[in-house]
Amino acid sequence: MSQNVTYAFPLQVTSTTTGVHSGADHIVFVKNCKGKKFASSAKPSGIKLFSCMETGSTNPLFHKSFMLEKSGLPLFDVVILFSAKIVYDEQECRLKIWNTPAISGIIQSDVVKQLHDYGMKVVISVLGSEEAGVAHLTDAACKTFAQEIANYCEAYDLDGVFFDDEYTDSWNHPGLTSPSSERAARLCYETKMAMPDKMVTCYIYSRTCGFHSKIEGMEPGDFVDYAISD
C-alpha cells in the first residue's frame, strides 16, 4: 500500500459481542492516526477557532487534517461535538444527558484522546429536546443538572460544555419552569461552579444570550468562557 492513497475494501463483519442492532443506520470506524503530537494548538495571536460539528455524518478526526502553513500548528483549537440532549427520564424522575448513537460511539472510543494529542480541546454540546431545555430549569434543577454535566465531562475526559437553546417549548416536568435568558444564565453559573476548570460556552441564539445581570455577585463573563455565533 502506498502513502497518501485512498483505498476501498469490502468488509464482512461478524460480531462476537452484544449491543449490535441489525436495524442501525450507521457504524463508526475509528482510525488510530499515530504521528506528531502537540502540547497545545494555541496561536501567538491569541485567536481561537471553534468547530461545531454534526457528529451524525462526520468523523471528528477530520480536524487533524487542517494545519497552519507557517507555524505548522493545528488550525482548530476547540471541537464541539453536536450534540447530546437534555431529557427527562420518566423512570428515574430526573433530568439527564442523553447521547445519540454517534455521540456514544465517539466518547467511548479514543477519538477524544486523539484530538487531545493534537492539542485541541473537546467540548460536548447539550441541546434541548421535546421534554426539556437548557433555559427551562429551576434554581434547584440547575444545580443538580450542572453536577451531572461535570460528572459527564470528567467521565469522558471532555473539556467543557456548549449550551444550545433550540427545539424546546415544553416545561411540564418537575424541575422545569417558564424559559428565559435568566434561567439559561443560572445553568451556566451553576455549571461553572460545578467544574471551574472546564469551559462553559453558549450559542448566541434564542435564550442562551443576553445575559445582563450578575448571579451571586458574578458577572456573566466570569461564568461563561466563550459565546459563539454563526
Q: Locations of the language-model features?
A:
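Chitinase-like catalytic core of GlcNAc-active glycosidases
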Residues: F38-D230
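Short, solvent-exposed loop/turn segments at the edges of extracellular beta-sandwich modules
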Residues: T14-V20
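C-terminal edge beta-strand
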Residues: S22-K37
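Surface-exposed, short loops/turns at beta-strand junctions within beta-sandwich domains
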Residues: S2-V5
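Extracellular recognition modules
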Residues: A8-T14
